Amino acid sequence: MEPTQTINLIALSLIVVVHAGVLALRLGISLGRN
């Protein structure tokens, strides 16, 4: 694999993880308020 492909994969996975974390946080906050 080319280095650029590896970097792109790492960046994509990081973005996915961050999005999942933000969604989980929002869900937890909204559930906690109810």
From Swiss-Prot:
Primary localisation category: membrane
Q: Which GO terms describe its cellular component?
A: photosystem I; plasma membrane-derived thylakoid membrane
Gene Ontology BP term (one): photosynthesis
Q: Where in the cell is it found?
A: Cellular thylakoid membrane
Assigned keywords, A-Z: Membrane, Photosynthesis, Photosystem I, Thylakoid, Transmembrane, Transmembrane helix
Span-the-membrane segments of this chain are 9-29
Membrane topology designation:
Single-pass membrane protein
Q: In which family does this protein belong, per the annotation?
A: Belongs to the PsaM family.
In its UniProt entry, what is this protein called? Photosystem I reaction center subunit XII
**Annotated organism of origin:** Prochlorococcus marinus (strain MIT 9312)
Tell me the organism's taxonomic lineage.
Bacteria, Bacillati, Cyanobacteriota, Cyanophyceae, Synechococcales
